[in-house]
Amino acid sequence: MSKLKIAVSDSCPDCFTTQRECIYINESRNIDVAAIVLSLNDVTCGKLDEIDATGYGIPVFIATENQERVPAEYLPRISGVFENCESRREFYGRQLETAASHYETQLRPPFFRALVDYVNQGNSAFDCPGHQGGEFFRRHPAGNQFVEYFGEALFRADLCNADVAMGDLLIHEGAPCIAQQHAAKVFNADKTYFVLNGTSSSNKVVLNALLTPGDLVLFDRNNHKSNHHGALLQAGATPVYLETARNPYGFIGGIDAHCFEESYLRELIAEVAPQRAKEARPFRLAVIQLGTYDGTIYNARQVVDKIGHLCDYILFDSAWVGYEQFIPMMADCSPLLLDLNENDPGILVTQSVHKQQAGFSQTSQIHKKDSHIKGQQRYVPHKRMNNAFMMHASTSPFYPLFAALNINAKMHEGVSGRNMWMDCVVNGINARKLILDNCQHIRPFVPELVDGKPWQSYETAQIAVDLRFFQFVPGEHWHSFEGYAENQYFVDPCKLLLTTPGIDARNGEYEAFGVPATILANFLRENGVVPEKCDLNSILFLLTPAEDMAKLQQLVALLVRFEKLLESDAPLAEVLPSIYKQHEERYAGYTLRQLCQEMHDLYARHNVKQLQKEMFRKEHFPRVSMNPQEANYAYLRGEVELVRLPDAEGRIAAEGALPYPPGVLCVVPGEIWGGAVLRYFSALEEGINLLPGFAPELQGVYIEEHDGRKQVWCYVIKPRDAQSTLLKGEKL
């Protein structure tokens, strides 16, 4: 790792010596420098203000000549003053190096700094991992290429916990403990746990630390499957489901406003555990998505005020957010910024750092904010939480993953975190404006009008600080969500959501022609742009501080190009050459509009948008026949049979089934196949056969080919009499 540089104004006198590389200040973005030397003229022209605004804390020196004097108001903001004096050049150089070295050291947060120092010691390893700094890989040409591709430093940093010098990641000692304490401070938590196998594991840690069989868990039906696994299958808790919204475009919405009313919640409890309906605080835990995959953001203050007194704890699954407290207009939705008292619930927040923060894949973190209930019976102490943590953590952690979490916290510390996210918000707004100005059919998912004026007519700076430009106002046609209250939800400004033609925004019905978003997504991938996901007539692009306008303009250019191909009805072989080549016999002679029409007609024929909506409405929830944990145990014991989808109607699901993404279960183990869920999967099955190349990923069901047709199969619980036979010796 090379030393950071010194940035120097081109108008500075030559008044210091240094062994570091020097670059002109206008050639640097301030991320590769350890100190900056300005002229007095630079300071008076605002350069010092620009440097301070970054929040990086880079030491700044002012070089003077001709007996210039630095105005007193600047002195507290700088590290020193250099005069143009030949005899002091080396002395000033030592001052500069001291400041630069100190900055370089504090720039590296505790765990990363310890890791770098340890690797630089060059210890001879006779412990795990067996590749021992990459040397084993270098014994073979393939392994050597592997090391050369990723770089030696990654392999040297892959350490074993056999050396206590690096502390302990499981019992949180030494540098790992300091790193997590630092993250807790940055994110306003009482305690933070770094998790190295994704938020699926973070959720299970929390759920296994809190829930036991018989506990009531208030359960957002939008919850990721990991919450079902942890709360229902592993812990055996009893769910009380909250219905959620879907709109005609396929976007995942929030929980209905009426679901947060106490009287309604007690009615739901009476349906599953009548003896608990009148308890003062009946729920051990509520599990709520702070932000849905499709960018519907909750107001945490509202959630706590409405249901907090009914819950011991609330888990805000923040896999798809985590940056909200660094964006001023989103701060009210952050559960970690809440002022809480002894009557409030304990707060737990899980964040997928790898999704939209700065982390390697699988990096996640758990934030615990519950000191306000410490001493109460419901309080979960660290030792109990860590017991669950160790159940799900590997004893062979990958140290670079942990270091990435440490760096993520450092990057978000202070002004720099807020600056990065404001840049992201601004770029997202400008990208939406470009699409509105240049596209005719593909539209950003934002209000058409704000106070009677077009959304895009407002200044970007105003939109970036005013939530009105992203709020779901009840009854407005542009979003088509039902059941929302005023100021309940808003669109995440850092999720670029677009809609494609095919839905009449005024009534939510299918139009005669449409463009399913999967066709657009495949076109973009063919041309080197990878969206996060698509569904029905919606497509999602994640925005992070990594974006710049050049990258976003490339996206807009491809959207415009797609629209031109659509208008000219270009041959499918030109638009989607890879899919066409793989399925040339099926799509021979097809045009783009022909494919769009055929897929759109399939959706309309099955009314897929309505099926999606119904699956998450209480009226259409699958009927519960068994506790999810009991159904899972039956599956593990083999008390199941694999049946075709049509034969599953009326049978008890042994596995949870879902399309991925988004990873939200449509049917839960123990529920009965039928209704909207069965019709939805039947529509997917028809699409898989009718339109090869566009098959979704399905989990919990199995696609098998019989007589030239692909069929969906699923496991269901055997009838009781069949189970009895099995227990007497029948072999599966």
From Swiss-Prot:
<dbReference type="InterPro" id="IPR011006">
    <property type="entry name" value="CheY-like_superfamily"/>
</dbReference>
<keyword id="KW-0210">Decarboxylase</keyword>
<dbReference type="InterPro" id="IPR011193">
    <property type="entry name" value="Orn/lys/arg_de-COase"/>
</dbReference>
<dbReference type="GO" id="GO:0071468">
    <property type="term" value="P:cellular response to acidic pH"/>
</dbReference>
<dbReference type="InterPro" id="IPR027464">
    <property type="entry name" value="Ornithine_deCO2ase_N"/>
</dbReference>
<dbReference type="InterPro" id="IPR005308">
    <property type="entry name" value="OKR_de-COase_N"/>
</dbReference>
<dbReference type="GO" id="GO:0030170">
    <property type="term" value="F:pyridoxal phosphate binding"/>
</dbReference>
<dbReference type="GO" id="GO:0042803">
    <property type="term" value="F:protein homodimerization activity"/>
</dbReference>
<dbReference type="GO" id="GO:0005829">
    <property type="term" value="C:cytosol"/>
</dbReference>
<keyword id="KW-0663">Pyridoxal phosphate</keyword>
<dbReference type="InterPro" id="IPR027568">
    <property type="entry name" value="ODC_inducible"/>
</dbReference>
<dbReference type="InterPro" id="IPR015424">
    <property type="entry name" value="PyrdxlP-dep_Trfase"/>
</dbReference>
<dbReference type="Pfam" id="PF01276">
    <property type="entry name" value="OKR_DC_1"/>
</dbReference>
<keyword id="KW-0745">Spermidine biosynthesis</keyword>
<dbReference type="InterPro" id="IPR036633">
    <property type="entry name" value="Prn/Lys/Arg_de-COase_C_sf"/>
</dbReference>
<dbReference type="GO" id="GO:0008295">
    <property type="term" value="P:spermidine biosynthetic process"/>
</dbReference>
<dbReference type="GO" id="GO:0033387">
    <property type="term" value="P:putrescine biosynthetic process from arginine, via ornithine"/>
</dbReference>
<comment type="pathway">
    <text>Amine and polyamine biosynthesis; putrescine biosynthesis via L-ornithine pathway; putrescine from L-ornithine: step 1/1.</text>
</comment>
<keyword id="KW-0456">Lyase</keyword>
<dbReference type="GO" id="GO:0004586">
    <property type="term" value="F:ornithine decarboxylase activity"/>
</dbReference>
<dbReference type="InterPro" id="IPR008286">
    <property type="entry name" value="Prn/Lys/Arg_de-COase_C"/>
</dbReference>
<feature type="modified residue" description="N6-(pyridoxal phosphate)lysine">
    <location>
        <position position="355"/>
    </location>
</feature>
<protein>
    <recommendedName>
        <fullName>Inducible ornithine decarboxylase</fullName>
        <ecNumber>4.1.1.17</ecNumber>
    </recommendedName>
</protein>
<dbReference type="InterPro" id="IPR015421">
    <property type="entry name" value="PyrdxlP-dep_Trfase_major"/>
</dbReference>
<dbReference type="InterPro" id="IPR015422">
    <property type="entry name" value="PyrdxlP-dep_Trfase_small"/>
</dbReference>
<comment type="function">
    <text>The first enzyme leading to putrescine and thus polyamine synthesis.</text>
</comment>
<dbReference type="InterPro" id="IPR000310">
    <property type="entry name" value="Orn/Lys/Arg_deCO2ase_major_dom"/>
</dbReference>
<dbReference type="Pfam" id="PF03709">
    <property type="entry name" value="OKR_DC_1_N"/>
</dbReference>
<comment type="similarity">
    <text>Belongs to the Orn/Lys/Arg decarboxylase class-I family.</text>
</comment>
<dbReference type="Pfam" id="PF03711">
    <property type="entry name" value="OKR_DC_1_C"/>
</dbReference>
